Amino acid sequence: MVIFYFCGKTFMPARNRWMLLLPLLASAAYAEETPREPDLRSRPEFRLHEAEVKPIDREKVPGQVREKGKVLQIDGETLLKNPELLSRAMYSAVVSNNIAGIRVILPIYLQQAQQDKMLALYAQGILAQADGRVKEAISHYRELIAAQPDAPAVRMRLAAALFENRQNEAAADQFDRLKAENLPPQLMEQVELYRKALRERDAWKVNGGFSVTREHNINQAPKRQQYGKWTFPKQVDGTAVNYRLGAEKKWSLKNGWYTTAGGDVSGRVYPGNKKFNDMTAGVSGGIGFADRRKDAGLAVFHERRTYGNDAYSYTNGARLYFNRWQTPKWQTLSSAEWGRLKNTRRARSDNTHLQISNSLVFYRNARQYWMGGLDFYRERNPADRGDNFNRYGLRFAWGQEWGGSGLSSLLRLGAAKRHYEKPGFFSGFKGERRRDKELNTSLSLWHRALHFKGITPRLTLSHRETRSNDVFNEYEKNRAFVEFNKTF
């Protein structure tokens, strides 16, 4: 016989547009000496351990299955007239995790008056999970578990769906229950992998890095040394040791909620120019919600900064964030931050800031991604309006892994404008408010063959340039460094 396989394309004549073309019907219809199937409504089909059978690779299923020279053409009406064949096909599709088969057979099976409600509910859950409707799948699985608590196959799917939807506490409970079941070794190994992943989600995450940088113009002195009768500071070059260390922990709550706490310290040390040493340390804590597609939260923070080894300022603030996967390849990242800075050296420099950032990331494949972003930053100083400005920025990044060579690169470009409320010292002579234009570029290169204890060094070259109608604020800065980062 010949049975066509249907997976979204029409291979049959127009008069048979609704024909079901599934190989699994062959065994259901023509199996020799097949014993009569018992009533599916009384069968404990959800107590099987075979729920995690690997899905059928649809690309390897032949379009036609030949046997005895016959051709079987079955449409929905024919199946409805043969409830036993329809039930066999539905059951076979479910236990083999044949998503394509479930998608075709389920709508017809639901029209059958003598249907197995549990089988239909299970199929609806599998299909919803495959289509990314995880909350709907969880609802179906929970209804099934309530009816049949001793169903490890369903519980495994429920636990996986909860894990996927970031309901970590509920997922951990289900996986703990599964661990007590007498499951096959392969499934028990899968349960342990999930439990390990859940522990890692809530474990402390520590990251750090350092680099040695050769910098040009570390004091950000103007490009000109003379302007009229004024003499500006000379540009200072130097070597810096940059460092960063941070730790963060997440505590999972019910229904996808979580709390976080963390701290970090970063800065740079100039061995030959200690007056330029700069360090920032901060702590933060917050609450958030995450599921399969989005992650949103609110965090409060406190930061302290030292400059030249002396206390310089501290900042208190809050940050909102919302990240969402729009599609499997497109992701949006949004955040808003407000903070109040207190300058411990000069009270007239106290200010508040507001920052809003939006990014769009496109993951072309596992080896390439593109990112574009828009930023707005506003700083206000009640005591000195000359420091007040708005900054409008654009960002672009391109990450690439170059084929099988092992070489990877990351290119970053940024441009921004600063509009000040009042003229600067030199722009005031022209009767103009201060206006700055910024340009930032950097290129990072690394090779996966070069690593030591899990650390792959990155070579980075960067250039920063500011052009201004106030000559004192025009400068260029170049850096070259090798960076070492580690997360554990």
Swiss-Prot record:
Keywords, in A-Z order: Cell outer membrane, Membrane, Repeat, Signal, TPR repeat, Transmembrane, Transmembrane beta strand, Virulence
A Pfam family: TPR_Slam
GO cellular component annotations of the record: cell outer membrane
Disruption phenotype: Does not surface present lipoproteins TbpB, LbpB or fHbp (in strains B16B6 and MC58). Bacteria are considerably less virulent in mouse sepsis model (shown in strain B16B6 only).
Membrane topology: Multi-pass membrane protein
Ribonucleoprotein listed as a keyword: no
InterPro entries (alphabetical): Slam_C_b-barrel, TPR-like_helical_dom_sf
Signal sequence, renumbered to the chain: 1-31
Annotated transmembrane regions: 204-214, 241-252, 257-267, 280-291, 294-304, 316-325, 330-340, 354-364, 368-377, 393-402, 407-417, 439-448, 455-464, 478-488
Function of the protein: Required for correct export to the cell surface of some cell outer membrane lipoproteins both in Neisseria and heterologously in E.coli.
UniProt record similarity statement: Belongs to the Slam family.
Domains as described in the record: Consists of a soluble N-terminal domain and C-terminal probable beta-barrel in the outer membrane with 14 predicted beta-strands. Expression of just the C-terminal domain restores about 30% levels of TbpB lipoprotein and nearly 100% levels of fHbp lipoprotein on the cell surface in strains B16B6 and MC58, and confers surface expression of lipoproteins TbpB, LbpB and fHbp, but not HpuA in E.coli.
Subunit structure: Interacts with the C-terminal domain of surface lipoprotein TbpB.
Protein name listed in UniProt: Surface lipoprotein assembly modifier 1
